[in-house]
């Protein structure tokens, strides 16, 4: 049997592969809004009901509970394994939102509203003002975008006679959805919108609001082609799902008018509608001018009185639902998303959610925005972006470094940048942290490598052009680090300086304000090859390349609600627990890995380490130590509320913090006898630990962390 493809199909497949490889996803939320009817609960325009009693404080805000409701489209041909991967991705996103946002919960199950204009043929004027007189015989229920809402999620239908006070029930109230603050319908389908724009991975909209204007329900549609095995990227699906869900929760142009001013609510006053959320600046650019947003913008740029600019591509006279790309590279809420490891939930976006009035934002959540930090009032304008001296924009088409210095970048532009050029990450081979990549002989690709501007050469003319190259780095303090070139010693690299490396001609530029931020001095291990006893073990490797820290620890989980513990439910619980621990420690969820056997109880061995599928972040240098100090300030427990498992308790089996395994360089003076002694001691310790574990733990099968890849980067033979 032969298979033929039309030129359109071939073009579409090539385009899809190209966009996927670039990890760029376009968002069409603003166009989807125009097709989504919204059902509201009698929202009061100027004054809204008090969100919490006069005497209460923020204690009445509780973690946001988002409940996904899965629906498959008729043309969604994906496997059960792919569906499970999607559920795991959304579970991570909902846990992230639950730890970030809190709401004032309503009692009972969530019941959505019916649209009176759909189910009612006519209404009374008096005395039963605006109450339904006759039901529409053609009424076929409610929809959320293209999704039909189940009747048991909806309120009932009642009709009134002219004068009677009691109505007649035509449709009973549904049971509702328990333990839910926001109901998310999840659809998988290859819709016309998916086919029209191959770069669209998913799109979403809200469709119901409560009396205060807060969205109650929405829908997210995942395009089937991006969920197929050959295209699937878990980190990218998580990124896009978070972006779209933030739209449905309130970051949407059609909801700006519903944002509330609750600054006086703590004194017992009712929240009021904000007079105006958006306005244009002197250049005609729409910006959000709300108090917390302006405060965070001022802290970010180093000036006062600046609003946050919104995307103007396609919306010359309207406010957009995205941040302007020229100002917010790396933000989760730009219209064109960068690769997941270069995109973050930023403080300006969190400030917007604070100013919505419906949410309390967790102040301990780590958020970052490096793009434009301290660049001043005129940063990001089309008239100023031609100045490449700021280190953010560039000119021409040179090979340099992405502004986070995790990747090499090519100086280029796109339709959202309005002629400005930035260093966009290379499509292939530019990740300095990926050891499989290769480059010039002096380069080192490794989890601890970063991109540096350099023109280093060995024995050749030093007049080469400066471009991005990958070298090892190690942090010594805040914005203080060393750099290592292939076959060189560690060299101090003062931030902002140009340095030379022994044995090479040329220079390296040491970036300032983007490496070793938030550094904490490692109190559990040193940067010299010394032996550390106790829970913390220093493993020495005979290699010139240091490896990233690997954390291993064990937890015991208890739940208050009984379940029949199938392997699927256990796996679901494990994914949830890993997400909670990651959020608590402030590390990426993918940093934590575990495994489980069907005959085991709820005790899990967990390993934290960077991998190819989990690239490091700018804070990667402190990720392991964040886990180490997770329970030092109190009892070794984490207790949280789960929508499925009720109350969940996570207990660290050892009373001390998790053990850290850190690899260091082995100096030439460490002789074989010392190595043998260490190996013998390790074997004795392993036997002792095995007996102790068999005696006291109900669950065994703990596994040691895999040794990180220490091999030298692969260098093509013609470059050696």
From Swiss-Prot:
Cofactor binding summary note: Binds 1 zinc ion per subunit.
Protein's UniProt keywords contain Cell wall biogenesis/degradation: no
Keywords in alphabetical order: Hydrolase, Membrane, Metal-binding, Metalloprotease, Protease, Signal, Transmembrane, Transmembrane helix, Zinc
Pfam families: Peptidase_M8
Transmembrane segments: 669-689
Residues in the signal sequence: 1-25
GO molecular function: metal ion binding; metalloendopeptidase activity; peptidase activity
Group of enzyme by EC: hydrolase
GO CC terms in record: cytoplasm; membrane
InterPro entries in alphabetical order: Peptidase_M8
Side of membrane Cytoplasmic, spans: 690-720
Residues reported to bind Zn(2+): 243, 247, 322
Topology feature Extracellular, residues: 26-668
Domain of life: Eukaryota
Disruption phenotype annotation: Embryos with CRISPR-induced cirop null present heterotaxy phenotype (heart looping and intestine defects). No other ciliopathy-related phenotypes such as body curvature, kidney cysts or hydrocephalus are observed in cirop mutant embryos.
EC number: 3.4.24.-
Gene Ontology biological process terms from the UniProt entry: cell adhesion; determination of heart left/right asymmetry; establishment of left/right asymmetry; proteolysis
Function: Putative metalloprotease playing a role in the process of LR patterning.
Family to which this protein belongs: Belongs to the peptidase M8 family.
Protein name: Ciliated left-right organizer metallopeptidase
Organism for this UniProt entry: Xenopus laevis
Organism phylogeny: Eukaryota, Metazoa, Chordata, Craniata, Vertebrata
């Amino acid at each position: 049997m032969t298979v033929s493809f039309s030129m359109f199909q071939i073009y579409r497949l090539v385009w899809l592969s190209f966009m996927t490889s670039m990890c760029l996803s376009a968002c069409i939320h603003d166009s989807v809004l125009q097709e989504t009817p919204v059902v509201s609960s009698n929202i009061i325009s100027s004054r809204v009901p008090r969100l919490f009693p006069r005497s209460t404080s923020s204690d009445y805000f509780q973690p946001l509970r988002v409940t996904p409701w899965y629906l498959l489209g008729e043309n969604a041909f994906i496997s059960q394994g792919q569906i499970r991967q999607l559920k795991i991705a959304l579970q991570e996103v909902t846990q992230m939102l639950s730890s970030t946002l809190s709401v004032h919960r309503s009692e009972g199950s969530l019941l959505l509203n019916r649209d009176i204009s759909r189910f009612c043929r006519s209404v009374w004027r008096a005395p039963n003002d605006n109450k339904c007189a006759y039901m529409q015989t053609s009424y076929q229920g409610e929809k959320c975008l293209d999704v039909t809402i189940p009747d048991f999620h909806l309120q009932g239908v009642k009709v009134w006679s002219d004068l009677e006070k009691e109505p007649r029930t035509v449709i009973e109230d549904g049971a509702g959805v328990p333990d839910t603050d926001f109901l998310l319908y999840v659809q998988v389908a290859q819709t016309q919108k998916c086919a029209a724009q191959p770069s669209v991975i998913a799109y979403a909209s809200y469709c119901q609001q409560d009396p205060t204007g807060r969205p109650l329900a929405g829908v997210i549609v995942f395009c089937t082609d991006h969920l197929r095995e050959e295209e699937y990227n878990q980190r990218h699906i998580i990124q896009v799902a978070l972006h779209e869900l933030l739209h449905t929760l309130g970051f949407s142009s059609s909801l700006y008018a519903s944002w509330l001013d609750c600054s006086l609510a703590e004194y017992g006053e009712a929240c009021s509608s904000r007079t105006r959320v958006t306005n244009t600046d002197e250049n005609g650019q729409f910006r959000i001018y709300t108090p917390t947003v302006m405060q965070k913008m001022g802290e970010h740029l180093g000036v006062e009185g600046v609003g946050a600019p919104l995307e103007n591509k396609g919306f010359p006279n309207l406010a957009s639902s995205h941040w302007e790309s020229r100002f917010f590279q790396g933000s989760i809420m730009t219209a064109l998303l960068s690769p997941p490891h270069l995109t973050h939930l930023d403080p300006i976006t969190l400030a917007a959610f604070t100013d919505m009035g419906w949410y309390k934002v967790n102040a301990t959540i780590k958020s970052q925005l490096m793009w434009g930090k301290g660049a001043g009032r005129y940063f990001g304008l089309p008239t100023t972006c031609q100045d490449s001296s700021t280190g953010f924009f560039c000119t021409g088409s040179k090979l340099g470094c992405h502004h986070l210095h995790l990747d090499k970048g090519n100086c280029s532009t796109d339709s959202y940048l309005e002629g400005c050029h930035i260093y966009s990450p290379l499509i292939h081979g530019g990740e300095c942290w990926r050891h499989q990549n290769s480059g010039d002989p002096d380069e080192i690709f490794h989890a601890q490598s970063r991109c540096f501007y350099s023109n280093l050469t060995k024995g050749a003319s030093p007049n080469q052009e400066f471009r991005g190259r990958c070298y090892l780095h190690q942090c010594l303090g805040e914005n203080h680090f060393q750099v290592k070139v292939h076959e060189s010693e560690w060299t101090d690299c003062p931030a902002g300086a140009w340095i030379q490396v022994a044995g090479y001609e040329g220079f390296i530029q040491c970036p300032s304000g983007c490496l070793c931020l938030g550094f904490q001095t490692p109190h559990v291990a040193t940067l010299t090859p010394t032996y550390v006893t106790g829970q913390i073990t220093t493993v020495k490797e005979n290699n010139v390349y240091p490896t990233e820290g690997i954390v291993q620890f064990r937890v015991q989980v208890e739940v208050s609600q009984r379940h029949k513990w199938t392997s699927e439910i256990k796996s679901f619980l494990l994914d949830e627990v890993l997400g909670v621990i990651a959020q608590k420690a402030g590390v990426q969820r993918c940093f934590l890995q575990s495994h489980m056997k069907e005959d085991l109880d709820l005790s899990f061995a967990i390993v934290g380490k960077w991998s190819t599928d989990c690239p490091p972040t700018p804070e990667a240098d402190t990720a392991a130590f964040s886990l180490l100090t997770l329970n030092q300030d109190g009892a070794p427990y984490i207790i949280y509320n789960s929508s499925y498992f009720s109350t969940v308790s996570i207990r660290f089996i050892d009373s001390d913090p998790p053990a850290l395994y850190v690899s260091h360089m082995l100096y030439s003076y460490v002789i074989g006898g010392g190595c043998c002694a260490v190996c013998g001691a390790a074997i004795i310790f392993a036997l002792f630990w095995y007996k102790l574990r068999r005696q006291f733990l109900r669950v065994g099968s703990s596994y040691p962390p895999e040794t990180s890849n220490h091999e030298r980067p692969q260098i093509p033979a013609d470059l050696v």
